[in-house]
């Protein structure tokens, strides 16, 4: 074990009982959140193995770190392990979970293991319906710029680090807090961020929005009395919750009553410029290397966290200006030459109507002269059903729309909540005539006829559409890379 690993194996240092844990097994190890925690643990010196249904970039990276990866779930693969980590996406009848219980091997949720990593560190937990990955990445980048050398666990690839997780040589742990299954209630951070609260993952909350809101309050009350809640006052639901939070609160937003306020927002292509206003100090000019008002809010959250920790403005401003982005968050994949001219290709993970609307707005602001062509893959039948009218309205705002089949994420189809239904409803609005395609082959043959010179082509969604964007970027359409 390297000196850094030995020095910062804090689970063993602070919890002597963790010394009896030598081999940790992850079921569903290829997920971004699961893989991130696995990477931190293997760098702390634990033996790691795990399984998933297919290889991906996460499993390939973990293999390079010495993690044993199994493709497919089989009962014998958990034999000899000391603890099994699982996400709530894994079915209770999974043979590895069944075997672990029969063998009396402890089974813990992903968030429980993250909570153990955070227990003896200065934890910063970022929660909210949208913006978690970007905000967490910005905070981690600022702390790295300030030589705080944080440990971080992020739900997307931080381009500057080449990974979504890293074991740092300090007391700081910066991580996303997942409300989708209410597992963020396991966390006990020193700083909690709430970016916004909207109806999503409502099956977890029995369709009760009030229960979702009260769960966020419970999350904030996991802070110690000396902790800090950083909250976006621009979000109406977050603003409503402020009087109910019995902890120190720092607010941020464009609103005049925000503690950390942005003024004079201007977007220039990919970058966003604004004036930062805080009580008791001079205004300063800030540029964040991300497009859109929503990303200014994410930057304000990171500034609020850093300011509370007395990080110098110089490090904050430099980190935001030099930010290299996150995989699949308005990720520019290049400009390509087609038979009809040049096309700019952007890939984005957003899959909630508000996220898609923010992406469209950023594209319009940064590239107002470009025709916006979107390939959208709905994510989950339940989300499409619950937010159907919002999707119809938002998707009608592009110039050309191509709809792929719903990425089910394991859900059974819901009648009337599929892409063909969306196509019909959008067409009935009369703003544009969407195109439904049943598969990748049909799409790839269609695109050369659809695209025009100067287009901005946006691949949008949380399913496997990211693979499709790479297919396009790898010249499968006969494109020639220009930049």
From Swiss-Prot:
It holds the Pfam family Mur_ligase_C. The keyword Cytoplasm applies. Its EC number is 6.3.2.8. Pathway: Cell wall biogenesis; peptidoglycan biosynthesis. It is found in: Cytoplasm. One of its GO terms (biological process) is regulation of cell shape. One of its GO terms (molecular function) is ATP binding. Its main location: cytoplasm. ATP binds at residues 128-134. The keyword Cell wall biogenesis/degradation applies. Transmembrane segments: none annotated. Gene3D superfamilies: Mur ligase, C-terminal domain, Mur-like, catalytic domain, NAD(P)-binding Rossmann-like Domain. It catalyses: UDP-N-acetyl-alpha-D-muramate + L-alanine + ATP = UDP-N-acetyl-alpha-D-muramoyl-L-alanine + ADP + phosphate + H(+). Cell wall formation. This is UDP-N-acetylmuramate--L-alanine ligase. It comes from Shewanella violacea (strain JCM 10179 / CIP 106290 / LMG 19151 / DSS12).
């Amino acid at each position: 074990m390297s000196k850094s690993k030995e020095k910062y194996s804090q689970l063993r240092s602070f919890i002597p009982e963790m010394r009896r844990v030598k081999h940790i097994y992850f079921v569903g190890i290829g997920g971004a959140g699961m893989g991130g925690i696995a990477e931190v643990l293997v760098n702390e010196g634990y033996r790691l193995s795990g399984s998933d249904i297919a290889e991906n970039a996460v499993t390939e990276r973990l293999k390079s770190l010495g993690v044993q990866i199994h493709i497919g779930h089989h009962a014998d693969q958990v034999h000899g392990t000391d603890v099994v980590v699982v996400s709530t996406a894994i079915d209770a009848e999974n043979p590895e979970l069944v075997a672990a219980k029969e063998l009396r091997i402890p089974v813990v949720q992903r968030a429980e293991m993250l909570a153990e990593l955070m227990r003896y560190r200065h934890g910063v937990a970022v929660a909210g319906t949208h913006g978690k990955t970007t905000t967490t990445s910005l905070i981690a980048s600022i702390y790295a710029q300030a030589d705080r050398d944080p440990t971080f666990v992020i739900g997307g690839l931080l381009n500057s680090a080449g990974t979504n997780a890293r074991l740092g040589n300090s007391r700081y742990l910066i991580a996303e807090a997942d409300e989708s299954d209410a597992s963020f209630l396991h966390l006990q951070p020193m700083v909690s961020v709430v970016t916004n609260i909207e109806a999503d993952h409502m099956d977890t909350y029995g369709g009760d929005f009030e229960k979702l809101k009260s769960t966020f309050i419970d999350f904030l009350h996991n802070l110690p009395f000396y902790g800090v809640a950083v909250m976006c006052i621009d979000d109406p639901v977050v603003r409503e919750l402020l009087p109910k939070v019995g902890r120190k609160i720092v607010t941020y937003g464009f609103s005049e009553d925000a503690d950390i306020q942005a003024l004079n927002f201007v977007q220039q292509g990919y970058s966003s410029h604004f004036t930062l206003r805080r009580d008791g100090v001079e205004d300063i000019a800030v540029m964040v290397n991300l497009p859109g008002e929503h990303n200014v809010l994410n930057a304000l959250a990171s500034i609020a966290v850093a300011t509370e920790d007395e990080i110098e403005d110089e490090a904050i401003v430099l980190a935001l200006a030099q930010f290299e982005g996150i995989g699949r968050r308005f990720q520019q994949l290049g400009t390509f030459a087609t038979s009809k001219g040049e096309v700019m290709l952007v890939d984005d993970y957003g899959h909630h109507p508000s996220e898609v609307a923010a992406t469209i707005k950023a594209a319009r602001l940064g590239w107002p002269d470009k025709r916006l062509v979107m390939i959208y893959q709905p994510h989950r039948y339940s989300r499409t059903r619950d937010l159907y009218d919002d999707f119809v309205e938002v998707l009608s705002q592009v110039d050309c729309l191509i709809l792929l089949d719903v990425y089910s994420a394991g859900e059974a189809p819901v009648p009337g909540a599929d892409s063909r239904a969306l196509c019909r409803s959008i067409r009935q609005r009369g703003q544009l005539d969407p195109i439904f395609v049943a598969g990748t082959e049909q799409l790839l043959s269609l695109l050369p006829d659809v695209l025009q010179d100067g287009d901005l082509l946006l691949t949008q969604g949380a399913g496997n559409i990211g693979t499709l964007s790479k297919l396009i970027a790898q010249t499968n359409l006969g494109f020639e890379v220009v930049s």
